[in-house]
Amino acid sequence: MRIPRTLLALRLFVPGALVTVLALVGCTQSPAEHDDRLTKAAGLARVSILCPKDLWEETKPTGGINEVKATVSKVSTGPRADRGLVRVSMTGTNLVAYLKELDSNAHPSSWNGEKKNTAASRRVYDAIAPEIDRIKAATSPEDPAPEIVIDDTIPEQG
């Protein structure tokens, strides 16, 4: 039995088109430096992020492929006490997973559209990215772990 050419073409075209659409839907529009940041972050022993508790809750991965293990503690002493901030401490490999989650939510493909936490994820990604770019190798064992502060009520220094 011979299959008409149009039917054969249709059988080949539809699955190919479906695979293409599914591939595009899963894409993000990552910044050009994203892969370099992931590589650099992977080499960090530990990093701390100080941010509002709600911002962490909104952007932390909640299962799926980008699971993040982090220690979260309330900032209760020092000049940033009583501001609703938390210190999120994680290893470099967990920072990689967090950055992947942030990138996926902050830079969705035009096919996916924005997610409910796109703005929050973009804010965190945009704060973490330049800090990772600035990290230099430790010069002594006493050098502190990198600390990234996300609190827009504190004026930037520099």
Roles of regions detected by a PLM:
Residues 2-158:
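Positively charged, low-complexity terminal tracts
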